[in-house]
């Protein structure tokens, strides 16, 4: 009688199982490599060293939101270059900048476009040590102002003082001030800070401040800072890629709003040199500010663009008037 293969022989099942595992593994490896090869590479250049303004970008990359949209995104720092120039010349597809920079660039025929407001309202203002007794812009007279040497910065300071009937010429401007905590009360009596970073850090250190928010001085100063930018040329030629980028980025910032502690951990994982306590506090503050009273994260109000464009022109911060409707766009945000 001929030998028959027992169809219930366990060794047959082992061989079949191993064959299936190897086939599936091979398919998965091929699929992963194919997926990686198909990802479109783009970059986003930050405006400054990494901080909590940028957390949504790191979250979108870390949690695979960019990859879900078919994008491989490099997060770059500007180094000695200016982000606006990097984006305008096509060396980076996207960047982080400020509303006043976009307006100034467009007045010089550099067609940058803001495609999202990272924070819905201006969270910056003038800060001083409480013991300095600076409670209103009237108290700026006779004091030293620590400046980072921005033309719009000094124009806003001057306009603020004039509105309150104070004399800007009675302020001593100290140039080259960039580190609030090492200079306030020593080299300068008051400085311009972003509350979501330096303000919450002062709270953590137990440093009592007097703080005058810009948006409470005049509605025109409630402009967008920072913003996500691209160039007109790139947006026109790559509308779908731009929409994919913004879809992932919006999801990243929505995560920051919903889970600020987890988002802080992601930023710290990618930028371990940051102070964990400062990042955690900053994220708790910004989670309420990223979207604030807007319906969706990133949306830009035409009124904000119109009034600040007009103000910059009136103050002669730009030589040519800028069409505000061309300086920003909401069309790349997911509906």
Report the location of each language-model feature:
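Bacterial N-terminal signal peptides that target proteins for export
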Residues: 2-14
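C-terminal motif of bacterial Sec signal peptides marking the signal peptidase cleavage site
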Residues: 22-26
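Bacterial lipoprotein signal-peptidase II cleavage site
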Residues: 27-35
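Short, glycine-/small- and polar/acidic-enriched structural segments
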Residues: 35-177, 182-185, 189-193, 222
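Pocket-lining segment of extracytoplasmic ligand-binding domains
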Residues: 100, 179-271
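Periplasmic-binding protein-like
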Residues: 118-128, 208-235, 246, 285-289, ...
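Secondary-structure end/capping motifs
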Residues: 236-314
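Conserved C-terminal helix/tail region of periplasmic/extracytoplasmic solute-binding proteins
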Residues: 305-335
């Amino acid at each position: 009688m001929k030998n028959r293969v027992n169809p219930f022989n366990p060794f047959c099942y082992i061989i079949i199982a191993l064959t299936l595992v190897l086939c599936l593994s091979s398919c998965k490896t091929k699929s992963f490599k194919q997926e990686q090869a198909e990802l479109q590479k783009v970059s986003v250049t930050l405006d400054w060293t990494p901080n909590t303004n940028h957390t949504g970008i790191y979250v979108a990359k870390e949690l695979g939101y960019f990859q879900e949209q078919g994008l491989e995104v490099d997060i770059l720092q500007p180094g000695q270059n200016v982000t606006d120039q990097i984006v305008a010349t096509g060396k980076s597809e996207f960047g982080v900048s400020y509303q006043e920079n976009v307006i100034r660039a467009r007045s010089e025929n550099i067609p940058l476009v803001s495609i999202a407001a990272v924070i819905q309202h201006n969270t910056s203002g003038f800060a001083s040590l409480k013991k300095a007794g600076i409670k209103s812009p009237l108290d700026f007279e006779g004091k030293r102002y620590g400046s980072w040497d921005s033309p719009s910065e000094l124009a806003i300071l001057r306009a603020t003082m004039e509105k309150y009937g104070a004399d800007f010429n009675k302020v001593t401007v100290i140039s080259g001030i960039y580190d609030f905590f090492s200079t306030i009360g020593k080299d300068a009596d008051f400085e311009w800070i972003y509350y979501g970073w330096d303000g919450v850090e002062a709270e953590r250190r137990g440093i009592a401040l007097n703080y005058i928010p810009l948006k409470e001085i005049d509605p025109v100063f409630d402009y967008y800072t920072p913003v996500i930018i691209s160039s007109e040329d790139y947006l026109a030629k790559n509308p779908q890629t731009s929409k994919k980028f913004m879809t992932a980025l919006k999801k990243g910032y929505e995560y920051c709003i919903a889970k600020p502690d987890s988002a802080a951990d992601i930023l710290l994982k990618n930028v371990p040199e940051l102070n964990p306590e400062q990042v955690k506090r900053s994220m708790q503050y910004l989670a309420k500010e990223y979207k604030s009273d807007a319906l969706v994260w990133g949306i830009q109000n035409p009124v904000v663009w119109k009034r600040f464009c007009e103000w910059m022109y009136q103050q002669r911060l730009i030589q040519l008037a800028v069409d505000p409707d061309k300086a920003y766009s909401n069309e790349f945000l997911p509906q």
